[in-house]
């Protein structure tokens, strides 16, 4: 029995170029149209997301339905931030607080949506600022970071056009100790205690 000659590295590459090209095209299609990895560069989403976390952002679902309250989204900066020097290629990550037609207000450390106080168990601390009631226009959303007092978000620059949304942050894959699905948070109006 004879041993087959070992192919040269060049011959191996030449024989596998079509396979490598198909793999590259598939990887690029997935990256640009289905999902992409993202790195968290700031503390604006503490305690939900920490600086250095790495996420998978899916890009398909918002083509079939709009974002929902509680979704954590990744988006390109709106026009006001671009005027301030942010590049359109940069990405932000925040939580959707209100949808078109809803009102948002921040008063005495409480966020209100449509006049109802929100019970926000995921925030780092209550906001130390006030925001008069504003109505979200059609085609836009109101977003806030979970680290309310250290977040450049809609309370600073206004509404986010839905066309700026890149995708929905679904899964943290790094660090391994915090690995898991992010999901959406269901907002529950705060309970009012009435003393009788």
Curated annotation (Swiss-Prot):
<comment type="similarity">
    <text>Belongs to the peptidase S26 family.</text>
</comment>
<dbReference type="InterPro" id="IPR036286">
    <property type="entry name" value="LexA/Signal_pep-like_sf"/>
</dbReference>
<keyword id="KW-0472">Membrane</keyword>
<dbReference type="GO" id="GO:0004252">
    <property type="term" value="F:serine-type endopeptidase activity"/>
</dbReference>
<keyword id="KW-1133">Transmembrane helix</keyword>
<feature type="topological domain" description="Periplasmic">
    <location>
        <begin position="36"/>
        <end position="196"/>
    </location>
</feature>
<protein>
    <recommendedName>
        <fullName>Probable signal peptidase I-1</fullName>
        <ecNumber>3.4.21.89</ecNumber>
    </recommendedName>
</protein>
<feature type="active site">
    <location>
        <position position="44"/>
    </location>
</feature>
<keyword id="KW-1003">Cell membrane</keyword>
<dbReference type="Pfam" id="PF10502">
    <property type="entry name" value="Peptidase_S26"/>
</dbReference>
<dbReference type="GO" id="GO:0005886">
    <property type="term" value="C:plasma membrane"/>
</dbReference>
<dbReference type="InterPro" id="IPR019756">
    <property type="entry name" value="Pept_S26A_signal_pept_1_Ser-AS"/>
</dbReference>
<dbReference type="InterPro" id="IPR019757">
    <property type="entry name" value="Pept_S26A_signal_pept_1_Lys-AS"/>
</dbReference>
<dbReference type="InterPro" id="IPR019758">
    <property type="entry name" value="Pept_S26A_signal_pept_1_CS"/>
</dbReference>
<dbReference type="GO" id="GO:0006465">
    <property type="term" value="P:signal peptide processing"/>
</dbReference>
<keyword id="KW-0812">Transmembrane</keyword>
<feature type="topological domain" description="Cytoplasmic">
    <location>
        <begin position="1"/>
        <end position="16"/>
    </location>
</feature>
<keyword id="KW-0645">Protease</keyword>
<keyword id="KW-0378">Hydrolase</keyword>
<feature type="transmembrane region" description="Helical">
    <location>
        <begin position="17"/>
        <end position="35"/>
    </location>
</feature>
<dbReference type="InterPro" id="IPR019533">
    <property type="entry name" value="Peptidase_S26"/>
</dbReference>
<dbReference type="InterPro" id="IPR000223">
    <property type="entry name" value="Pept_S26A_signal_pept_1"/>
</dbReference>
<feature type="active site">
    <location>
        <position position="94"/>
    </location>
</feature>
């Amino acid at each position: 029995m004879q041993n087959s000659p070992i192919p040269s590295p060049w011959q191996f590459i030449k024989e596998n170029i079509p396979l490598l090209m198909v793999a590259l095209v598939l990887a690029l299609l997935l990256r640009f149209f289905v999902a992409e990895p993202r790195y968290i560069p700031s503390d604006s989403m503490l305690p939900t997301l920490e600086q250095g976390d790495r996420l998978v952002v899916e890009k398909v679902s918002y083509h079939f339905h709009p974002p929902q309250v509680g979704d954590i989204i990744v988006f390109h900066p709106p026009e006001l931030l671009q005027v301030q020097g942010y590049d359109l290629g940069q990405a932000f990550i925040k939580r959707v607080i209100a949808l078109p037609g809803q009102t948002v207000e921040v008063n005495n450390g409480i966020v209100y949506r449509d006049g109802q106080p929100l019970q926000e168990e995921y925030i780092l601390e209550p906001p130390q600022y006030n925001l008069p009631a504003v109505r979200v226009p059609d085609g836009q959303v109101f977003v806030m970071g979970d680290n309310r007092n250290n977040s450049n978000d809609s309370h600073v620059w206004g509404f986010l056009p839905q066309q700026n949304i890149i995708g929905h942050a679904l899964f943290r894959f790094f660090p391994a100790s915090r690995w898991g699905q992010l999901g959406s948070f269901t907002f529950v109006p705060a309970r009012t205690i009435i003393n009788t």
